[in-house]
């Protein structure tokens, strides 16, 4: 089996406050293979975006990586100096954020921004970098790229700006792309186009993609595998088809049961009672136990570790008695 592009092992991220230390990420592990799209889904506050920021080394103080290891194609990157990590960002790891305006300088033409990024990571002349920029704009679906390359960010629609950001993310042909809610601010029809674009680029370039979103519809359309996060932990991870059609963790079951369907014989939508706990008030044992209809005494005391169950891994005591093995 080939080495994964991204390998995260027992990652812990903490934020220090005046009164206590809050653990936003609590011992998660996962891999992403070459050309694979891993969707990371969960409610607001589950730790999805913090996980992505930890991978690219952008956890701001008072936050810090408190434990665990992150590997990019075998190279450990969580302990690199800020300068070394800066060289990796953009060249080996591309980033797509929710609001494209935060990634684009409104005072510069998009061509200038693309050319600067390309020349930062490749030894190309100004003319060659401009030709590369035009090719990238065409690849991400910008019409008339020879003309639009001289446009400013405000002259593009939201969907077209996001395409420009994607072009920036792939201009150095990175091994990994972190896409954090890349379709949230877009119309539904534009969302579908961006989803298809990210999936195609990952396949065509062999790029690993970590897609962070709260939208299971986006995950189902785009991802090969999905990790369901809850209170800084991975509740369940597995092939997206298996997790959607046969979720194992009670929280994952609730998420899938809350997705509307057009089927005439569909069951009533599931409502998960309560809300995700604050970081300062995560209960002992399984963090989902106060909201879980299947919780028993062990759930309130002992943290469940991931158990491999078929193609999925689930962190739930309900599956301890099943024929399975503890996930590495």
Predicted features by range, described:
Residues 2-5, 14-27, 58-65, 81-84, ...:
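A short, flexible loop at the N-terminus of ABC-type nucleotide-binding domains that lies
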Residues 3-4, 143-147, 237-328:
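Short catalytic/signature loops enriched in Gly
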Residues 43, 57, 83, 173, ...:
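P-loop NTP-binding/switch modules centered on Walker-like glycine-rich loops
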Residues 65-76:
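Conserved ABC transporter NBD signature motif
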Residues 75-76, 128-147, 256-257:
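Conserved ABC ATPase "signature" region
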Residues 151-156, 160:
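Conserved ABC ATPase signature
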């Amino acid at each position: 089996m080939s080495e994964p592009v991204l390998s995260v092992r027992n990652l812990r991220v903490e934020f220090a406050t005046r009164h206590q230390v809050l653990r936003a990420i609590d011992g998660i592990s996962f891999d992403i293979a070459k050309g694979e799209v891993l969707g990371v889904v969960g409610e607001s506050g589950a730790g999805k975006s913090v996980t992505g920021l930890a991978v690219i080394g952008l956890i701001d103080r008072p936050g810090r990586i408190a434990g665990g290891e992150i590997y990019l194609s075998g190279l450990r990157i969580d302990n690199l100096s800020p300068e070394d990590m800066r060289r990796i960002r953009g060249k080996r790891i591309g980033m797509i954020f929710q609001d494209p305006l935060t990634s684009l300088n409104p005072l510069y033409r998009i061509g200038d921004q693309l050319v600067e990024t390309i020349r930062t990571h490749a030894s190309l002349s100004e003319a060659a970098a401009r030709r590369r920029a035009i090719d990238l704009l065409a690849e991400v679906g910008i019409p008339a790229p020879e003309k639009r390359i001289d446009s400013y960010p405000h002259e593009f629609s939201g969907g077209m700006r996001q395409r420009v950001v994607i072009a920036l993310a792939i201009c150095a042909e990175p091994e990994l792309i972190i896409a954090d809610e890349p379709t949230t601010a877009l119309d539904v029809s534009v969302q579908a186009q961006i989803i298809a674009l990210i999936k195609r680029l990952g396949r065509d370039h062999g790029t690993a993609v970590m897609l962070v979103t709260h939208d299971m519809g986006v995950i189902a359309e785009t991802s090969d595998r999905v990790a369901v996060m809850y209170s800084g932990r991975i509740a369940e991870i597995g092939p997206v088809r298996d997790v959607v059609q046969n979720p194992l963790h009670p929280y994952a079951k609730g998420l899938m049961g809350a997705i509307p369907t057009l089927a005439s014989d569909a069951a009533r939508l599931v409502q998960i009672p309560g809300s995700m706990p604050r970081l300062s008030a995560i209960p002992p044992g399984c963090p989902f136990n106060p909201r879980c209809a299947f919780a028993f005494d062990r759930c309130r005391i002992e943290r469940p570790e991931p158990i491999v169950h078929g193609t999925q891994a689930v962190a739930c005591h309900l599956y301890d008695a099943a024929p399975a093995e503890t996930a590495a």
